[in-house]
Amino acid sequence: MNAQLDGLSVSSSSTGSLGSAAAAAGGGGGAGLRLLSANVRQLHQALTALLSEPEREQFTHCLNAYHARRNVFDLVRTLRVLLDSPVKRRLLPMLRLVIPRSDQLLFDQYTAEGLYLPATTPYRQPAWAAPDGAGPGEVRLVSLRRAKAHEGLGFSIRGGSEHGVGIYVSLVEPGSLAEKEGLRVGDQILRVNDKSLARVTHAEAVKALKGSKKLVLSVYSAGRIPGGYVTNHIYTWVDPQGRSTSPPSSLPHGSTLRQHEDDRRSALHLLQSGDEKKVNLVLGDGRSLGLTIRGGAEYGLGIYITGVDPGSEAESSGLKVGDQILEVNGRSFLSILHDEAVKLLKSSRHLILTVKDVGRLPHARTTVDQTKWIASSRIGESITNSAGFPGDLTEEGTNKPGFYKGPAGSQVTLSSLGNQTRALLDDQARHLLTEQERATMMYYLDQYRGGTISVEALVMALFELLNTHAKFSLLSEVRGIISPQDLDRFDHLVLRREIESMKARQPPGPGVGDTYSMVSYSDTGSSTGSHGTSTTVSSARERLLWLIDLMENTLDLEGTCETTQGSTNALPDVSVDDVRSPSEDLPGIKPPPPPPPLAQGHDRLLGQTRKPVREDSAPLSSAAHSGIVFSAPRNRSPPPPPGIAPTPTPGPSSARDSPSSPIYASISHANPSSRKPLDTHLALVNQHPIGPFPRVQSPPHLKSPPAEAPGAGACLPPPSPSEHADAMGANQHFVLVEVHRPDSEPDVNEVRALPQTRTASTLSQLSDSGQTLSEDSGVDAGETEASTSGRGRQTANTKNKNGKELPQTERTTEGANKPPGLLEPTSTLIRVRKSAATLGIAIEGGANTRQPLPRIVTIQRGGSAHNCGQLKVGHVILEVNGQTLRGKEHREAARVIAEAFKTKERDYIDFLVTEFNVML
């Protein structure tokens, strides 16, 4: 064996070194030439030499799970089981060289010594012995035969492919047929009558179990069941020049904000000698502080300086972009809320700041749901302790509630929590919802409890409100307060919604089947299929080589770091005896709207009460370039439930925005005579909501060439938010086009489609539980005193700053040129002045799609399109500056619009639009 590894020197390769040899990369059953790095070839050779074919398959499953989730802890924990000898553990340093740099620090920590794992105890199986003489972890057969057609089986299941896990037995009723035949809680059901359950959804598993009188189950004694989801926020980090970088060394674990502040400053090594400094600021009359900050405890971050104005006191005192503010006037900024930090910096003319030169900034955030498991030793406790504290039911490392026995999905018999209280629901809602959303949900529940609305109306309203995977799980707690006579209807409606979302997210082709091995417990099973890899055994080695190469060469979210904003969501737990067929349609009942709660904003220009918010918005990769966000359709989602009014949209004058608000603030105590855009503006990240049961992919991004940028011009004030309150598209394939100044080329960043249903909402209502673009378009990239001081809100008539009304004409297109599906031959010419640094629209569609012509789905606040006031969400764009978009694919149409905005030949763009959709 040593002879086989003579050429496998760990120290001979360096991270990122590229090999010159070409090798075949497996993908969709085909092979193509690709340059593989020396690290990839080295690891692949070692895998062939050290592992058997089944072990390599398990290794492939392990990498699939890591590639889908980017969870280093799960990767290392699985490798501890697979690499069970010192010789096999020689693969670890080779694997380290091909994982993304941002994960290597965590990989080193979890593997103890960095390169080699210490000797570990074997994986502990359940203490009870498996029936029929099978040892723990072995596959056995359980035969169940109903004496009557409608006799119950006596057990409940949870899990499914929509949750990224298999099908597990979560409850076995005492004295039931299942108990007599040896079925146990914690068993994973692999097959039912020769039908594999490896990749089936929860509903499909129920159908398979109820479809026959005689059942022969192949079960695996896993000794654990999925307990729920913990939602982790993943951040990308950049340096002051906008280049992607690794996270700060003080944030490796994602639980820092929950530590005591006194402990953090020592345990996280924030106060090493030379790292921090004291800055004494005394603001005289007419002098501005000139700081732009980002972060806050509500985002799991500290307070970071993202902008320093030229000539300000902050610049004179040596503050710079990339500094973290640790303390101000004796008040710790390590776990302070964003608004409190803004208030404190505004409140004094004499500031003593303690700052640390971190040299990194949080750039963009995405949300990842991680499955938490309940060990066999705690399963019985979780079943019997219905009123117990949920935090006591999870495995090690789980600090938040993770398991409840009455979740949404279907009727549950013995495993339901009939005595769930509203306090438990309120506690979960505090973790998952904003105050506004929580108040709205409680309003609907009060209306239902008072008999004002029916259970159907309540469920439909909650579907509209709980529009993300994490939020949707709250239905498990809502079920506890549903009246007994309404439980069947409630379960039926929720199950129907789940099935609809599953169908909407069906992959285009079959994926690689899962196995019952220990290393694939948490495998989502979608990553290989989503990349089109072959599913045949003969291509296993090519798949493994392709996966390793992909992991090293994919432009990943460099510098990601899991933060503390974790929230836990329960998995559906369904008794196979009580599921009814979802065949009825949802009624169109409109409940009364909730009282409009107050909205407040995160971003303020400190010391300037009448100035609009300065948003730290231009992407970091260039000084001040404009951007347009586009989206292309992937899978159409069903229309939103009828009769449910969307959540009230906060206006620009409100004091607090929704959670999707940018987490930045500009700080200035006095109005400076002039303001210039910084050399490094930071991106404003817009969060997009996703429907239930998401699979979050890491969005690739391209490095943007630096571009010299002139100062941004004045922007027209935005109109009323009611001007663009149209609903956005449901399922989108987001494409970001960064429109640079004419001396640079635009970048195009693509993010994989999230095939979930999404209910209609406006941009200001978007939840932060969705996928975040790695770089996005600026919303308000520049700010000048002339464009912001003493200016009122513009009305829907939309006149420019000189009082001249923008031209708007209507004309009729020829019948021969009418796009297919256009209901009326009426079009409108709208002239959009380039009044802001960004155009600020998102489009979907293009040639060869279900939407032949691009349609506007989002209009960002502060952009030129928003300032114009005439472009609306839903407008179909026929021409841009006289150039037709017929026959142009999505990317080409986006390029045409981007070039039209970028050109200096004219200071406006003429859009020929129609009010009607062009859906075919």
From Swiss-Prot:
State the Gene Ontology terms under molecular function: identical protein binding; protein domain specific binding
What InterPro entries does the entry give? PDZ, PDZ_sf, USH2_Complex_Protein, Whirlin_HN-like_dom1, Whirlin_HN-like_dom2
Which GO BP terms, alphabetically?
auditory receptor cell stereocilium organization; cerebellar Purkinje cell layer formation; detection of mechanical stimulus involved in sensory perception of sound; establishment of localization in cell; establishment of protein localization; inner ear receptor cell stereocilium organization; paranodal junction maintenance; positive regulation of gene expression
Q: Name one GO cellular component term.
A: postsynapse
Q: Where is this gene product found?
A: Cytoplasm; Cell projection, Stereocilium; Cell projection, Growth cone; Synapse
Which residue windows does the record flag with biased composition (Polar residues)? 242-257, 561-570, 655-674, 756-775, 785-800
SMART domains named among the record's database cross-references: PDZ
- Chain ranges of the PDZ domain: 141-224, 278-360, 829-912
Q: Which PROSITE patterns match?
A: PDZ
Q: Which CDD domains does the record match to this protein?
A: HN_L-whirlin_R1_like, HN_L-whirlin_R2_like, PDZ1_FL-whirlin, PDZ2_FL-whirlin, PDZ3_FL-whirlin-like
What are the start and end residues of every segment in region (Disordered)?
A: 241-262, 502-536, 561-603, 630-730, 752-828
Mark the residues carrying the PTM Phosphoserine.
S698
Q: Where is the composition biased (Basic and acidic residues)?
A: 802-813
Pfam families per the record?
Answer: PDZ
**Record keywords:** Cell projection, Cytoplasm, Hearing, Phosphoprotein, Repeat, Synapse
Give a short account of what the protein does. Answer: Involved in hearing and vision as member of the USH2 complex. Necessary for elongation and maintenance of inner and outer hair cell stereocilia in the organ of Corti in the inner ear. Involved in the maintenance of the hair bundle ankle region, which connects stereocilia in cochlear hair cells of the inner ear. In retina photoreceptors, required for the maintenance of periciliary membrane complex that seems to play a role in regulating intracellular protein transport.
Q: What is this protein called?
A: Whirlin
Q: Which organism is it from?
A: Rattus norvegicus
Q: What is the lineage of its organism?
A: Eukaryota, Metazoa, Chordata, Craniata, Vertebrata
Q: Could you tell me the gene encoding this protein? A: Whrn
